[in-house]
């Protein structure tokens, strides 16, 4: 039967190596204020997801054209469906130039605020946590929910 494995933290890939770097602290503080993040772990999760995307793009770039062909298009389509890129036919070099803002812009909290359903980014977070926001008719209470492109226009308020 064996013992259970201890679950790994998903944000460790995005956690900075030197957390007391002044420039990094100021940048993180600015991003937390702009996107209404509650703690740095939410920012580190976004960085970890971005790191996964760029690592995958770099590995695809290192392959030969024959090896890359069947893997490249599904990867680009997935990024397009999630809304991280604007066009599924972009070059892999453009995917490597993504930054953490591309991930943070797809969070439900940010989209609710940008749609004008909330007065501020913090108000958007409160509406979501209190269960006043539905995505495609289903109540979502996680402000960090990454909204796919197809569900973006199906966000509504529940009274």
Curated annotation (Swiss-Prot):
Pfam families in the cross-refs: S4 (PF01479)
Any one biological process term the GO annotation gives: translation
Keyword field: Ribonucleoprotein, Ribosomal protein, RNA-binding, rRNA-binding
Gene3D superfamilies according to UniProt: RNA-binding S4 domain
S4 RNA-binding domain segment(s): 106-158
Gene Ontology CC terms, in alphabetical order: small ribosomal subunit
CDD domains named among the record's database cross-references: S4
UniProt entry tagged with the keyword Amino-acid biosynthesis: no
Function of the molecule: One of the primary rRNA binding proteins, it binds directly to 16S rRNA where it nucleates assembly of the body of the 30S subunit.
Family, similarity comment: Belongs to the universal ribosomal protein uS4 family.
Protein name: Small ribosomal subunit protein uS4
Organism encoding this protein: Pyrobaculum aerophilum (strain ATCC 51768 / DSM 7523 / JCM 9630 / CIP 104966 / NBRC 100827 / IM2)
Gene: rps4
